[in-house]
């Protein structure tokens, strides 16, 4: 089975992050104070990587954060120590997957953003 998982995160006074699984309708959102948009996007991806680690399904993670996706795919440099720490955690988890893709999508196509109300 292919799982298409949409992630989203937001910074600011109502910061938090979450995901939505298109095939099952499962969604999750967690409030997290004092984080940036980029940190929230990383946290959403890490949460998905941890949750589905034991799955044998093909996993496609979609994010509307071009910066985060490009950094995780080694296309952009990471200049923030906080983001570098989150990226290392994500890369450690990514290495445990055999069939995983992390892709950028436009905000208008992000089902997590629509479902989570961000």
What are these regions (language model features)?
Residues 1-39, 50-51:
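RNase H-like nuclease fold core
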Residues 12, 49-117:
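RNase H catalytic domain
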Residues 41, 45-46:
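Short, conserved alpha-helix that lines the donor NDP-sugar binding/gating region
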